[in-house]
Amino acid sequence: MVELQGLHKSFNSHHVLNDMNLSIKKGTTLVVIGRSGCGKSVMLKHIIGVLRPDSGRVFVDGQDIWELKRRDMERLRKRMNMVFQGGALFDSLNVGENVGFELIEEGRVSEAEMRKRVKESLGMVDLSGVESLMPSELSGGMRKRVALARAICTKPELLLYDEPTTGVDPITADSINELIRSLHDKLKVTSIVVTHDMKSAYKIADRIAMLYQGRIIAEGSPSEIQNTDNPVVRQFINGLARGPITESTDS
């Protein structure tokens, strides 16, 4: 469903993506691991078309997104959604308004249909009946679930997750992992998750890829990644201070 070919992206003199290649099959969950700041979020922004590569191509369903007309690009984006690292909820809107925001803002459905979808989406993330609460009344884990409900409310075919378990305790993180896996199975969506949390990666991934120095250096099933001989991957997944990865080599 998604293919990245030879992506290069620099910000000033910092080369973030350096001939990055990656392919994601329809209906699978791919987890991209790597150190903080290695370019994982930049990769996601290329997939949804927020960032344009300096060179290279981004394909979604066989279409080069940067060769599409604006109207076609807008249609394509409506088939995707993203769960942001911090949730990105609007503090001035209640939960129901946050979850249904995109549907109403873009005039996709009637208000009655929007309320129906909001109720369904909140039920799928185990938050039934919280529509009237404000974001300030929610725990960190609840905010993450509301953000996920907002993402699935538009019925996307492709879901992108940016560090979905960052900032929550291990028990809440595990419940979010279970929810991601459950939603994938129920909705049959294609999912791309970026994280440096290996417990999450092993739990939710069909396949795992590691981004290092701007390119994918390893890809495989969770079992293959766990048993890799690649010294860089082994150092990262085992959380070891000593090894080929240093602050200078990863920058």
In which residue ranges do the predicted regions lie?
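Catalytic Walker B motif of ABC-type/P-loop ATPase nucleotide-binding domains
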Residues: 159-162
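Conserved ABC ATPase "signature" region
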Residues: 63-64, 111-129
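A short, proline-enriched helix->beta-strand linker immediately N-terminal to the Walker B motif
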Residues: 153-157
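Helix-to-loop junction immediately C-terminal to a conserved catalytic motif
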Residues: 48
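Conserved ABC ATPase signature
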Residues: 134-138, 142
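Short coil-to-helix segment of the ABC ATPase nucleotide-binding domain corresponding to the Q-loop/switch region
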Residues: 92-101
